[in-house]
């Protein structure tokens, strides 16, 4: 069972909530917008299923980009960047948060092989 969270701008349904990834289904009413905010360590992506969603992005105090997303469009906002969204019309979207993992996050003590080469 999903918990629907009411927002001033619409609703959000958390589908997956884990330490390094979150997935939310959001519905934003026409004219609705979220707070201007940033995430310290989360990267934020928006995928519009239906509707039109503006993604506003700032660098310091300067608005540097407004991207309009339509059905099947995606926008990614890096961690630490102020942003907000606003719906031009009723919009259904997926919002994904994740944190970067190191691709080289492995320390090998023994290299893999066949069992006759190494006695476990």
Predicted regions and their residues:
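Catalytic phosphate/metal-binding cores of nucleic-acid and nucleotide-processing enzymes, i.e., regions
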Residues: 21-23, 80-84, 88
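Short acidic-glycine-tyrosine-enriched beta hairpin
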Residues: 59-80
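Glycine- and acidic-residue-biased ligand/ion/polar-headgroup-sensing regions
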Residues: 41-60
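Double-stranded beta-helix
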Residues: 3-6, 86-120
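A short, N-terminal "cap"/entry segment at the start of jelly-roll beta-barrel domains
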Residues: 1-25, 30-36, 66-71, 111-120
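A generic "binding-loop/recognition-motif" signal
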Residues: 32, 41-42, 81, 89-90, ...
